Amino acid sequence: MARLSWQPLPIQRSAMADVILVALVSGPVAAPFLAHIPFFPFPIITNIIYWMGRRVCPQPDMALMVMPPNLMTVCMRCYGVLLALVLTRLLFERDRGKGAYWLHQYRFLGAAIATVLTFAYPIEMIIELLGWWEYNNYIVTTFGFLTGLGIGLFLVPVLYRKPNLKTYSV
């Protein structure tokens, strides 16, 4: 008699990752609108979203004004990272990690490329803080997007791969 070992179904893992990604992308934009709704539970949800944004974004005061007087919860640099993660998720759904642009298949070289792309965010922020250029939403979104591509092109295939189900005989 053969038994299957318990493993999470692929749909569970990818569905959970998709729910988290949707929350991360929609939360910063939704929070300013939710802040204008005084009815329970919207103020609580808004406070949670803003609290999370202040914890992850190094410059939340540079966020876009979406619904005056409320800003998005993260700056466009951080939001660029999230947009790139959404793009890589959609690309993965199209080719299931088989395209030449997926960095995990290049092992060390792919990890090196992902690392270089990931450092675009902090390098741009340091250059801005040193005064080489002023904060510009187009620039910071681009550098955030590059960082998100580095993260996404390397990790999305790992997060969304289908686990191998092994059978064991008793």
Where are the predicted features?
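Membrane-interfacial, low-structure loops and terminal tails that flank and connect transmembrane helices
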Residues: M1-I11, D95-F108, N164-V170
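Interfacial helix-loop-helix junctions of multi-pass membrane proteins
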Residues: P60-M76, P122-L146
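Hydrophobic cores of alpha-helical transmembrane segments in multi-pass inner/ER membrane proteins
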Residues: L21, L83-L90, F145-R161
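Hydrophobic alpha-helical transmembrane segments
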Residues: T73-D95
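Extracytosolic (periplasmic/ER-lumenal) interhelical loops and adjacent juxtamembrane/interface segments
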Residues: H36-V74
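N-terminal signal-anchor transmembrane alpha helix
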Residues: Q12-F42
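Small-polar-interrupted transmembrane alpha-helices in polytopic inner-membrane proteins
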Residues: A23-P28, R54, A84, H104-L130
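Membrane-interface helix-boundary signature
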Residues: Q7-A17, L103-I113, W133-I139
